[in-house]
C-alpha cells in the first residue's frame, strides 16, 4: 500500500516549527496557539495567564488578582492593603485613606466602620476611636473625625443639646458635662438644675 502524502495541520493549541513531523507540539503553560497550522506559540500578555498546556487562548486575571508579566502560567493574588476590582490587570490598587483590605484577594476596598478610622493608604486594618468618641460617617481618615459623645447617645457633643443625657438642656444645665446614666426628676434633681443631688449638687434647692 502507498503511504499518505497529505499533511495534517496542527490544530489550535499546538504548533510545529520543524518540517516532516507527525504531530504538533502542545503550547506551554503561559503560552497559546490561536490558529491551526501555526509554526510558533505566543506568550500570554500582561494581565493574562494560562496554567494548562495546549491551549488556544489565555485567561484574564480575576478580580482580586493580577498578572504583571508576559508568559504567566498563574495569576498573582493581591496582598492585604491592596485590591483589584477589574479583571485582566497587571497590578493591584492600594487602598485609600479611610478604607482597608484585611484579606488577600480582595476585589473591593472596605470602608472603615463607624467609630474607627484609617489614616493612611495601603492599610489592612483600622484604628479605633478613643473612648467616648464617635464618627458620624464611615470611611473616617483621622482621629480628628472622632468626636466627643459624653453620654453615648450617638449625637456628638457639638450637636447634642443634652451632652450628659440627664434630660436637662445644656443651656439650663448647671452640670452640662456632669454624670451620665441618670435622668433628672424630682427625686434625683430637686431643683431641676441638671446636677444630680446625691453626687453633684451642693444646693439641692
Question: Language-model features: where?
Answer:
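Extracellular calcium-associated, cysteine-rich motifs in secreted modular proteins
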Residues: 8, 26, 79, 94-97, ...
Amino acid at each position: 500500500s502507498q503511504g499518505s502524502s497529505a499533511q495534517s495541520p496542527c490544530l489550535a493549541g499546538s504548533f510545529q516549527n520543524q518540517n516532516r513531523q507527525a504531530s504538533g507540539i502542545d503550547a506551554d503553560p503561559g503560552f497559546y496557539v490561536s490558529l491551526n497550522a501555526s509554526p510558533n506559540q505566543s506568550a500570554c500578555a500582561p494581565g493574562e495567564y494560562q496554567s494548562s498546556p495546549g491551549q488556544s487562548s489565555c485567561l484574564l486575571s480575576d478580580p482580586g488578582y493580577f498578572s504583571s508579566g508576559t508568559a504567566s502560567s498563574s495569576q498573582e493574588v493581591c496582598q492585604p492593603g491592596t485590591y483589584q476590582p477589574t479583571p485582566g490587570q497587571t497590578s493591584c490598587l492600594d487602598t485609600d485613606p479611610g478604607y482597608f483590605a484585611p484579606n488577600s484577594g480582595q476585589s473591593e476596598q472596605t470602608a472603615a466602620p463607624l467609630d474607627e478610622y484609617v489614616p493612611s493608604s495601603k492599610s489592612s486594618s483600622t484604628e479605633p476611636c478613643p473612648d467616648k468618641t464617635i464618627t458620624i460617617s464611615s470611611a473616617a481618615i483621622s482621629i480628628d473625625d472622632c468626636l466627643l459623645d459624653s453620654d453615648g447617645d450617638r449625637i456628638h457633643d457639638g450637636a447634642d443639646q443634652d451632652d450628659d443625657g440627664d434630660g436637662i438642656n445644656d443651656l439650663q444645665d448647671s452640670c452640662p458635662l456632669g454624670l451620665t446614666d441618670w435622668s433628672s426628676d424630682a427625686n434625683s434633681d430637686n431643683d431641676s438644675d441638671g446636677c444630680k443631688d446625691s453626687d453633684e449638687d451642693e444646693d439641692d434647692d
